[in-house]
Amino acid sequence: MILPSEKSATDVAAQCFLNALIRETKDWQLAEYPPDELIIPLDEQKSLHFRVAYFSPTQHHRFAFPAHLVTASGSYPVDFTTLSRLIIDKLRHQLFLPVPLCETFHQRVLESYAHTQQTIDARHDWAILREKALNFGEAEQALLTGHAFHPAPKSHEPFNRQEAERYLPDMAPHFPLRWFSVDKTQIAGESLHLNLQQRLTRFAAENAPQLLNELSDNQWLFPLRPWQGEYLFQQVWCQALFAKGLIRDLGEAGTSWLPTTSSRSLYCATSRDMIKFSLSVRLTNSVRTLSVKEVERGMRLARLAQTDGWQMLQARFPTFRVMQEDDWTGLRDLNGNIMQESLFSPAWKTLLLEQPQSQTNVLVSLTQAGPHGGDSLLVSAVKRLSDRLGITVQQAAHAWVDAYCQQVLKPLFTAEADYGLVLLAHQQNILVQMLGDLPVGFIYRDCQGSAFMPHATEWLDTIDEAQAENIFTREQLLRYFPYYLLVNSTFAVTAALGAAGLDSEANLMARVRTLLAEVRDQVTHKTCLNYVLESPYWNVKGNFFCYLNDHNENTIVDPSVIYFDFANPLQAQEV
C-alpha cells in the first residue's frame, strides 16, 4: 500500500530482504546526486527508490524507510508488503517463474517480516542489553532479526505464532524437555567415554532426577523437545512403537532450557551439556533435522581430540576450543532403521558451565544491526572498551578487530593449512570469549560443519578414519571456507563497526588482510590463503534465489548451484 506518512525509520527485516537481493543482482544503481538513493527499476515507467543511510563495500547497507515508488505521475512512499510484491512480480516476469512458486515465496517473506516486527515490538528490553557485558544465555537470545542476507530470515514453517513464541529464541523463552520411557532395543547411538545406557542415565539424573524411578535395565529415559515429541506422535513408525508398548510418554519434566540462536540447540546454565535436537521445522533454507552422517562427524572430531595431533594444535592455540559432541542418540523403528527426526546430540560445554556469567557471546548477536536503530551490541562493547582503556573509539575498534583476528581467524586458517582440519565457522558457530569487552578466546560449536583436507589423512588414520566421508576437495574448500569465515562472519564485524563510523570498512578489512598475509607466511599449505588474498572473486551463497526457488539446502544434490561469484573485498585492501 501507499503510505500516508514519510517518517524515516529503521526497518531491519526489510533491510535483510533488500541486501540479500542487492548482493545477488546487478540491475540496481546508485543515484548520481544527493540525497543518496539506491534505485531498483521495475520497468520502463516505474522504479523503487531507497534512501541510503550507509553504503557498504560488503553489501551490509543501511536504509532509511519507507521506500518510494517513483512513476511518471510522482513519488509515493510504500510499505514492505507493496515493495516486496513489486520486486517479486518483476523477478517472476524476468525469470519466467511459476506463479505458485512466487506466491509461496511472498507469503513466507511476509510471515518472516511480521514475526520480526512482533518480536521487536515485544522485546522492549533489547536496548538495555547494550549497557553491559552479556553472558552466554543473554547473547543467544539477543538475535531478533536473523541472517542479514536472507529474504525471510525468521521463517519457521510449520510453527504457528504460539509455537514460535515458545520454541524460538526471539522472545527469550525457556521450557523443559519432554521425556519418554523407551525399550532399549529401540534406542541407537554412540558414546565415546560411557556406554549408551550410562550416558542417557547421567543426562536424566542431572536434568530430570524426578523421573529416575521410571528407569530399568530394559527401559531407558529418552528426551525430546516438546514440539518434536508431538511431531513424532504423528509419524506412522512412532505410532507403531507406542502401539507395541515400546515407548511411553512421561510428559514434560526437569530443568528449563532456553533455545539458542540456531533454534534447534538448547542451553541450560546448570547442565554440563548443551543439546542439539533434530527439529522438523524449515528455518530459512533447510529443514533442521540431523542425520547420522552429521552426528558421526561430531564423534570423529571427539576421537581426534584424544590424539597427539590435537594436543599439538591446542598447544599452539591454547585459547581456541571446540565444543565436543562426543555422543548421540536416536530412536529405531520396528525394522531397526535409525530415524533421523529423533536424533539428539549433547555437546560438552564444561567451559561455559564453570563460568556461566562469563562474557562468551555468539558473534551473530554482536553484529546484528540494532533492531530499533542505533548501535549494535558489538559497537556498544567497543565503546565500553574505549571508555575503560581511555582510548578513542577508532583505537578500540582496531584493538577489537586485531584481537578477533588473533583469536578466531588465525587458529582456523592455521588448522586448515597445517593440520587439514576445516571448521566452517559462520556467525552462529563462533563464540567469542571476551574479558572486559576484548576478545581473549574462541569456542567453535556445531561439528556437523567440520571437514578435512587430504593432508589430514595421516592424522585421520590414527583413529582409523582415513576414508572419512567429509574429506574436502580443493574446490569445496575454496567455495565454503572463505564464505563462512570471511564473508558471513568477519565482514559482519568490519561492517558493523564501519556503519557506526568507528572507522571505514576499508581500513578495518586492511587489518584483516594484514593478519591473513602474516598467517600465510607461517603455514605449510597455502592454497586457501593464496586464494583468499589473490583471487579476484570468491564464491558466496545466494540465499535470496535459493529461497525463491524453494531449495532445501540440506538435501540439494549439488550445493554449488546456489553459489555465485563475489568480488574479493580484500583485493582493494592490498598494502
Curated annotation (Swiss-Prot):
Regarding protein family, the annotation reads: Belongs to the IucA/IucC family.
- Give the taxonomic lineage as stored in the record: Bacteria, Pseudomonadati, Pseudomonadota, Gammaproteobacteria, Enterobacterales
Q: What class of enzyme is it?
A: ligase
Which reactions is this enzyme annotated as catalysing?
A: N(6)-acetyl-N(6)-hydroxy-L-lysine + citrate + ATP = N(2)-citryl-N(6)-acetyl-N(6)-hydroxy-L-lysine + AMP + diphosphate + H(+)
**The keyword Transmembrane helix belongs to this UniProt entry's keyword annotation:** no
List, alphabetically, the Gene3D superfamilies matched. 1.10.510.40
- Summary of the function given for this chain in its UniProt record: Catalyzes the attachment of a first N-acetyl-N-hydroxylysine to a carboxylic group of citric acid to yield N-citryl-N-acetyl-N-hydroxylysine. Involved in the biosynthesis of the siderophore aerobactin which is a chelator that mediates the high-affinity iron transport systems induced under iron-stressed conditions.
Protein name per Swiss-Prot or TrEMBL? N(2)-citryl-N(6)-acetyl-N(6)-hydroxylysine synthase
Look up the record and name the pathway of this protein: Siderophore biosynthesis; aerobactin biosynthesis
Q: Which Pfam families match?
A: FhuF, IucA_IucC
For this UniProt record, the keywords arranged alphabetically read as follows: ATP-binding, Ligase, Nucleotide-binding, Plasmid, Transferase
- What's a Gene Ontology MF term here? aerobactin synthase activity
Question: Knockout: what is the outcome?
Answer: Cells lacking this gene are not able to produce aerobactin and accumulate N-acetyl-N-hydroxylysine.
Q: Per the UniProt entry, what species is this protein from, by scientific name?
A: Escherichia coli
Q: What is its EC number?
A: 6.3.2.38
User: What highest taxon heads this organism's lineage?
Assistant: Bacteria
Keyword Acetylation attributed:
no
Would you kindly state one Gene Ontology biological process term found in this protein's UniProt entry? aerobactin biosynthetic process
